[in-house]
């Protein structure tokens, strides 16, 4: 079995744990793209909730 050669310092341990803390926030924020029809910011690969278009075609009718 693998055994550590030296004790992990508190600083190194905390630096490793900090990466997990920041990754939670990065995953929770979705990347946004621009709708080709109306120009609003939307989640990629989804129907635009503002105009109802997806890949240049109207999928749902909106007011």
UniProtKB/Swiss-Prot annotation:
Q: Which domain of life is it from?
A: Bacteria
Keyword set includes Ribosomal protein: yes
Gene3D superfamilies documented for this protein: Single helix bin
Give one Pfam hit by family name: Ribosomal_L32p
A GO molecular-function term, please? structural constituent of ribosome
For this UniProt record, the keywords arranged alphabetically read as follows: Ribonucleoprotein, Ribosomal protein
Q: GO CC terms on record?
A: large ribosomal subunit
Give the record's GO biological process terms.
translation
Q: Which family does it belong to?
A: Belongs to the bacterial ribosomal protein bL32 family.
Q: What is this protein called?
A: Large ribosomal subunit protein bL32
